[in-house]
Amino acid sequence: MRITLAQVDSRPGELDANVARAEQVIAEAVSTGTDLVVFPELSLSGYTIGDLKEDISIPPDDERMVKLARAANKGAGVLFGFPEAQAHGLHIYNSAAYYEDGQLVHVHRKLFLPNYATFEERKHFLPGQSSRAFPIMGGRHRAATLICNDAWQPQL
């Protein structure tokens, strides 16, 4: 399995610019034969959510997300970090969505939100409720997603 780790410098609050950059990264990765492109936490929004004046959360079926999923529709799966809107913006999660063949397969909502030093995620997000494995590569493999602080938890 070839995995591309997309190291991108996201622009805080600039969804369209970040989506355009992600599209370039996906095209380049797919052209090299990658099987999976993985983007960082909150890569589509930038991490500094608290500094933004407006809510930029989006649902996993947002047209920009679907566009990116289709860009990888040449045999590669893609995982994006984004602020997920639910219930008309009343619930916002720090999420990662996995797409394959242009379709949403799984959304992981960050479970363990830090709230110390410069990390104030609990002020902006609700924690997810569970973590589970999901099929990748046409069901030939299974994977699970952890977002940053989730990986430091011994129970996971």
Named regions from a protein language model:
Residues M1-L5:
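Extreme N-terminal starter segment of soluble prokaryotic enzymes
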Residues P60-E63, A87-L156:
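Active-site catalytic loop in hydrolytic enzyme cores
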Residues N18, I26-I56, L79-F80, D150:
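Active-site beta-strand/loop signature of hydrolases that rely on acidic residues for catalysis
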Residues E23-G33, R64-K74:
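A short, N-terminal amphipathic alpha-helix
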Residues A17, R21, D55-E63, H91:
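Alpha-helix N-cap and loop-to-helix initiation/capping positions
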Residues K74-Q86:
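Short, conserved loop-to-beta-strand elements that form functional interface hotspots
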Residues Q7-G13:
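Short polar catalytic/cofactor-binding loops
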Residues D9, S43, P83-A85, W152:
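Catalytic metal-binding/acid-base residues of hydrolase active sites
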